[in-house]
Amino acid sequence: MSTSTPSIFSRIIAREIPATVVAEDDRVIAIEDIAPKAPVHVLVIPKTEQYRNVTELAAGDPDLLAHLVATAQRIADERAGGQFRLVFNTGEAAGQTVFHVHAHVLAGELQEGTLAG
């Protein structure tokens, strides 16, 4: 994705906007969601803004997608005994509001009406 305005996630990665970082390496950053829908709600975000959604990421860089999933698993292992939901919203009608691919790691009881079981 190439735009003149960086996404909010790119601004977090650049440390222009504060966030609670729970994991980071050279390829991804994981932050606490600012409006959590479950006791554990972490966003895992690739540091590249090249991909708008998970289907673009899977086609363009499957190794980065695998790394993102492995990072999600590590977070779930540390915070939720390894049990978690991994959610990618793809498209505005599906609830995607930031068009910089990211995964939601959710664990524990979800807020009512958040997701189908």
Residue ranges and their predicted role:
Residues 1-117:
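HIT superfamily nucleotide-processing domains
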